[in-house]
Design a protein with these regions (language model features):
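Short acidic, S/G/P-rich loop/turn micro-motifs used as interaction or catalytic elements
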Residues: 31-33, 58, 85, 144-152, ...
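Short glycine-/polar-rich loops that comprise or flank the Walker A/P-loop
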Residues: 21-22, 47-49, 74, 169-171, ...
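Nucleotide-state-sensitive switch-loop elements of NTP-binding domains
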Residues: 56-59, 63-106
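Glycine-rich P-loop/Walker A and Walker A-like loops and their local beta1-loop-alpha1 context
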Residues: 2-65
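Phosphate-binding/switch region of NTP-binding enzymes
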Residues: 171, 176-235
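Substrate-engagement module of ASCE P-loop NTPases
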Residues: 150, 154-181
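Phosphate-binding/switch loop-helix module in NTP-utilizing enzymes
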Residues: 85-161
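Structural motif
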Residues: 25, 51, 137-140, 174
Length: 235
């Protein structure tokens, strides 16, 4: 089975990376740059693809963020839930697609399925690697924004479909959630859909993460930084 490298030795050296079909919740407070961590974890390596569902940034901003990491934009797709509200006539391209708003979960689901199908058919980009099933990294940035627009029970069902889809196609999913804005019931329900949780905290301007739910990987807090799409654990 395919393993998705993370660039974090504490994970890769123990289990080779995230197993295919794994869904990971990044639980982080505001202003902790969790999106930068998430993008580093879904940066597509050679032969891989990345898809971002963006409810916070325009597609162009997401592509720029990945460009700074050195990722090949030919293998990055964005489902943009922001731009169409201000530019209703904007048209989909092969790799950048648009929905009316973060409330349009049906539209998001359709665009996601269509993009997956395009990748599987080898029509997403030139220079296809030929791996099958094609390794796909997926990110929802962010679950917090979706929860502002839809009831928890509705969003739970939506995420249940997404996580099941990622498992079926042997991809890997990263989902960002603000750890300070929601009650324990909400956090608990979202966690039920995940295989593991990466918690992030900031203390005295130093970033820490810990991994929970991956067998053999320590759950101790680790100092870290992210630069150019690479996560570095600081001794």
């Amino acid at each position: 089975m395919y393993s998705y490298k993370t660039g974090i030795p504490q994970i890769d050296d123990v289990c080779g990376g995230f197993d295919a079909g794994t869904n990971i919740l990044i639980l982080a407070p505001p202003m902790s740059y969790a999106d930068i961590l998430a993008y580093a974890l879904i940066k597509p390596l050679e032969g891989e693809y990345a898809i971002v569902l963006s409810t916070n940034e325009r597609a162009a901003e997401v592509v720029d963020a990945f460009r700074l990491t050195g990722a090949d934009k030919r293998f990055i797709g964005v489902i943009d839930a922001i731009t169409k509200s201000s530019t209703p006539t904007i048209a989909d391209t092969q790799r950048l697609v648009f929905v009316s708003s973060p409330t349009d979960l049906t539209g998001i689901g359709i665009k996601f399925s269509n993009m997956i199908e395009t990748i599987f058919e080898g029509e997403f980009s030139e220079g296809e690697a030929g791996l099958f099933p094609p390794p796909i990294r997926f990110c929802v940035n962010s679950v917090s924004t979706l929860l502002m627009y839809r009831r928890l029970e509705v969003l739970y069902q939506f995420l249940h479909v997404l996580t099941a889809k990622l498992k079926k196609i042997e991809g890997v999913g990263i989902y960002l959630l603000n750890s300070e804005s929601f009650d324990d019931k909400t956090l608990s329900m979202i966690k039920q859909l995940m295989n593991c949780v990466i918690e992030v905290k900031i203390e005295q301007n130093i970033s820490y993460l810990r991994v929970q739910g991956i067998r053999g990987v320590s759950s101790e807090w680790l100092k870290f930084s992210v630069a150019k799409g690479q996560v570095t654990i600081i001794p």
